Amino acid sequence: MILKQAILTLVLVNANLFAQEPPKTYSSTDKETRQGPPKPPMGKRWVLNPDFSDEFNGTELDTTKWLDHHPTWIGRAPGLFMSSQVSVGDGFLKMEGKKLEKDTIVHAYGKDITFNIAGAAVVSKKATKFGYYECRVKAAATTMSTTFWFSSSNNFKGPKDCDRYGLEWDIHESIGREGDFNGSYFASGMHSNAHFWYTDCNGKKYDHRAPQVKFEDAKLTSEDFNVYGGWWRDESTASYYYNNRPPKHQKFYDKVKKKPFDQPMYMRLVNETYPFPWIELPNAEELSDPSKNTVYYDWVRAYRLVDVNDPNSEVEKDPTLKLYHENVTFPSATIEHKRSKSLEIPLSYQANEDREIAFILFDNEGKKIKEAILTAYAGYANLEYTLQLDQKLPLGSPYKLSAHIRPLKGNKKNSLDESTVYIHLTK
């Protein structure tokens, strides 16, 4: 209660201490990069998870999804998380770092802590588990952090019952400028970590880390927007995605628990001060410069896997959100298939809303043999479609199968995309 009252008092007292100068205007389309989830496993479909997704197109934080503070952490001194430094506008979630006019002492964790810098934190109200998570963000050009991460409590029962553990999954952490300090490399590229926080039966605490994943880049994270993504695949592994780069993969630390990352975590977007002297503290000049002191989150998006044929009807979809260039594709130009009364055809599609895929099978002379319709539920799907035939087809020349993705009850005239595959029948 003392801690909550102290934070509230600080927010009220300091909310008006800072002059609000208009920052440089950024466009959410400054640079196009790869975005959206990777190809899903066979038989699965990525769908948007709205509880952890936000385009930040309003004028205030969506309090049905987010807290404007960290519920259990007030910040790493000398940086204090303050709700006054969180805002939404111009299509962005903004976090503004500032120098406090005077030192502020907060009594927390059984001691007095001195703060002189204002930072910010936005935390999801719900916890989540496996899925793909990404954000598009431009870092502040300071030594304060720009982060996209998840964590749990540290009080889950361990394998010995008397021990405890917690989880932290850092998709990305960075700063926005370089300097003469060891952590200067955090100002460029992407840096991903996974922590297994462990307390043994004697109360000794350990930070067990998986090998760090890095993507190198010549440009600073504050020069432009970047897309950072992470696929929490299962209890043991994750994959990371940086702009248009191929993914890199990580195996979680598993010497205490064979499947360590088995608990839900909360999403956290944080602008904090890092440990000094590993990273230099931000100076007053950069903290007073509106062109440098603000983090811009363009959007955060989360996806979960469902079965291909799951309508996902319990989730309300936003028809204005165009996540994909809608398409249907086959994995190759030709396939071989054993002669049968059905054809099993691998394909994938991306659809912003429920669509249908029209299949037409032709013989070598262009004669239409079979037509069929597949309902393509919204999302990114990878599947094997079974085309039922009236009879076994003769061997010989290849057959052509065309696929058109279109609106429900549509026709060829309003086709959104089409693909073709040639099928060679074998005995």
UniProtKB/Swiss-Prot annotation:
Residues 1-19 form the signal peptide. It comes from the Bacteria. The active site is at E168 (nucleophile), E173 (proton donor). Keywords: Glycosidase, Hydrolase, Periplasm, Signal. One of its GO terms (cellular component) is periplasmic space. Its EC number is 3.2.1.178. It catalyses: Hydrolysis of beta-D-galactopyranose-(1->4)-alpha-L-galactopyranose-6-sulfate linkages in porphyran. Its main location: periplasm. InterPro entries: ConA-like_dom_sf (IPR013320), GH16 (IPR000757). One of its GO terms (molecular function) is hydrolase activity, hydrolyzing O-glycosyl compounds. Substrate binds at W73, R76, E168, E173, E272. GO terms for biological process: carbohydrate metabolic process. Residues 32-308 form the GH16 domain. It is found in: Periplasm. The keyword S-adenosyl-L-methionine does not apply. Residues 23-45 are annotated as: Disordered. Cleaves the sulfated polysaccharide porphyran at the (1->4) linkages between beta-D-galactopyranose and alpha-L-galactopyranose-6-sulfate, forming mostly the disaccharide alpha-L-galactopyranose-6-sulfate-(1->3)-beta-D-galactose. Belongs to the glycosyl hydrolase 16 family. This is Beta-porphyranase D.
